[in-house]
Structure formats: structure tokens, C-alpha cells
Amino acid sequence: MATSIMNQLLNLWAAIEIIVPIDHSCGRDKIVQITDTIGVMLTLKYGSKIFSDLYKSMKLWDKHTLNHFISKVPVEYGNDLERFIAFVVLSEYEPDRKDLYNLLNDFPLLRYRIYSINKKFSTPKSIHDTMSNHMRKLSWHIRRIYRTRNSMVHNLSDALF
């Protein structure tokens, strides 16, 4: 099983090196270029994934109640997901969110997710901070994968010679 995990990690890194274009003439390390490219790609989708996952969780909790609160947001905001996002982040819906929080007393994790996402995405500064924090964590994970891959490759080459 350990060999399988090692192979998966090596294959993942090989795929990353193939997919991400590396500019050898720019003077930046390969890992920096890979981290920057992948980090930006994954960070661009982060916000939509957060809201989409919360929306799905709310639909599973109580679709009719969710629709009741979404209906308070004008249709000009867009589709149901976009109206849900407006409901979660805009200050004008704070009284309605408090009503929703009361209905979620038996579901504290779901209630906290809404509260937390509201705090992370309600102002330009909080959005910037949230996205920057996500990008930094992605960078750490990518570098961790890179270090592990290098360790495996070097340990394997030491064992062979």
C-alpha cells in the first residue's frame, strides 16, 4: 500500500509538471512558478465552491425554508444561488439571517457556517483576506507535496546506489 501511495504522489507531481508551463528564463524557481499558477487557478474557484457547498447543505436541511429566505432577495440579483449569496453576505439581510439562525438552533454547525461565511465575504477587505489566506495555505500544501516527492526520489536513488 505504501508503494501505491508513493506512486500516486509521484504521478501527481509528474502531471503537475506537465500541465504547468515553466519558464526557465524568468529566473524564478520551478516550485514558485508551479505554486503561483496552481494557487491562482484554485483560488479563483474557492469562493464559488464555498457558496455552492453551503447552498447544497441548506437545500438538504430544508429546501422550502431556504426558498422562503431566497425569495426575500430580488430576482435582479440572478439565479437562486446568486440570490442566496446576496442573502448570506449583504448587510441589508441581517435581520432575516437572524431569523434563519433561530431556525437553525438544532443545527449549530450549519448556523456557524453561514455566520462564518458572512464574516469572510461581506466586505472587500474580508474577501481579500480570505482569498489571500486560502492562496497561502494552497502554497504550503503544494510545497509539502513537492518536498515529499523530492524526499522520496532522493531516498530511492540513495537506496539504488
Regions found by a protein language model. Give the residues of each.
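Amphipathic, oligomerization/interface secondary-structure segments
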Residues: 1-161
